Amino acid sequence: MASKRLGFVVVLALVCQHINAFPTPAGPDDKYNRELTEEKPLEQQIAEADSIRKTESKPTPPAEEETNSEDDDITFLKALAEKSKESNNETPISDSANERLGADDTDSTKNRRLADDYDSTKNGMDYKYQDDPESFRQLDGTPLTAQDIVQKIANKIYEEDDRGVFDRIVSKLLKLGLITDSQAETLEYEVAEALQDLITKNAKDNMIGDRSVDYPVSAAKDTQDEEDRPSPRFDEEDEVENEGGDDANGDEPQEEESRDDTVRSDDSWDAVSDGNDRNELNPEDGLQDLQFFPNFYRLLKSLDSEQDKEERETLITIMKTLIDFVKMMVKYGTITPEEGVTYLENLDAMIALQTKNKLGKSLVPLSITPPTGKAADDDDNTKTEAAKMQKEYESLKDSTKDVQTAAEISHPGKSESYLEAIRKNIEWLKKHNKEGNKEDYDLSKLRDFMDQQVDSYIDKGILEKDEGDVIKRIYGSL
C-alpha cells in the first residue's frame, strides 16, 4: 500500500516537472492564432487592411526634416537668382517691398513671382510700385497725384462744358468716404483755378486761329440772300417804267413810289449797296472780317486821304479787336451766340447813326420824303453824303472826341448802351496805348474802369440792369 502511494507521488512529480520544462504559449499569441483560424467579416478585413496601409505609408521624422532642408535650399537659390535678375534690370523697389519679398521667398508655397518672370507678356510694371498698391495710376503705371486729379477734373468740365461734372464726381467721392467736406471745398477751389488757367491758355492759343473760322457759312448764306432778294433800286426802276406805261392808275403807283422812296432813303446808307460793298472787298487790304459791316466799311473807304490814314488804321484795329473779342466770348460761353450777333449788328448800325449825327443828319428814320422819281438821283445823293462825310472827318483827328450819342438824344436801348460802352473802351485803349501795343494792355484796369462806367450808367437810367450785367460779364471774363 505504501509502495502504491510512493509510485503515485513519483508520477505526480514527473508530471509537474514536465509542465515546468515545456511552458505553454502566452495568451496574446494564442489569441492571434485563434484570429488566424477564425473567419472574419469582409468589412472588418478591409478596415484592418486600410489601417495597416496608413501606418506603413507614414514618413518618419528624420525623412521630413531632410525634405524641408532641401526645399529651403531650393528656395534660397531661387531668391538669389531673382535678386541678381532685379539688380541687372535696375528696377526700383522700396524697402518695404524687399521685406515682403524676403518673407515670401522663405515660404515654398509662394512661387507666383517666379512663374511671372518667365511670362513674356509681363513687363514688370505690376511690381514697380508695390509700396502703394491702392493708389490711382496713370496709363503708364505712375501714381496719380492730387494735382493730376485736379487737372483731369478741370479737363473733363472744359470738354463737356458742364460744371455739373464736378458735383457728380465730388458726390461720389463723398459717398465712398474717400474725401471729407473740407477736402471737397479745397478741391472745388483748386479745380476752379485749374479751369480758369485752362480757359485762358486755350483762348490765347486759339485766338489767332479763330479769326477767320466763324463767318464763312454766314457769308455764303448772306450772299445767297442777297442774290435771292430783289434790290429796292431795281424794283423802283420797274415801277417807274410801269408808271410811264400806265397813267390810268396814277394815284396808286404814286403811293407805292412814295413808300419805295422812303425805304430807299432809310436804306441808302445801310442796305442798298451791301452786296456791292462786299464784292468790293480786296483780299490784299486785310478787311475780310469787316465784310458784314457795310456801314463801317463804307466809312473806311471814305477815309482815303493821306491825312486820314492814321485815323483809318486806328478804326480798323479797334473794329478787328472787337470782332475777335466777341467771337472769343461766344466760343467760350461767356455770352450766347444771339447776344454776340446782336452786339455786332448794333455796332454797325450805331456806326451809321453816329456818322449821320456828325454830318448833321437826323438820327430817326425818315418817314416822309418827296419822291425823286429816278434811281440816278439816289446815286448822286449817296455820293454827296460820302463827300460831306469825308470833309467832316478831315477836321476830326480824335475818334474818341465826346459826341452826343444816340442814347442821349433818343430813348435808351441795347444799341446805344453797347455803343457807349465801346466808346469808353476806345477812350481807354487810346489812353493806355501811347507807347505800347495791344498786347501790353492791363486788362484788370480796363475791367475795373468798365465796371465803374456801367454802374454809373445804370444809376443814371441810361442802361438797364440786365444790359449792364451783360457788359460786365463780357469784360469780366478777360
Swiss-Prot record:
InterPro entries: SCG3. Residues 28-42, 97-120 have a biased composition (Basic and acidic residues). The lineage of its organism: Eukaryota, Metazoa, Chordata, Craniata, Vertebrata. It is found in: Cytoplasmic vesicle, Secretory vesicle lumen; Cytoplasmic vesicle, Secretory vesicle membrane; Secreted. The keyword Signal applies. It comes from the Eukaryota. Residues 63-74, 235-259 have a biased composition (Acidic residues). One of its GO terms (cellular component) is secretory granule membrane. Its main location: cytoplasm. Residues 1-21 form the signal peptide. It is a peripheral membrane protein. Pfam families: SGIII. This is Secretogranin-3. Residues 22-126, 208-287 are annotated as: Disordered. One of its GO terms (biological process) is protein localization to secretory granule. Keywords: Cleavage on pair of basic residues, Cytoplasmic vesicle, Membrane, Secreted, Signal. The keyword Zinc does not apply.
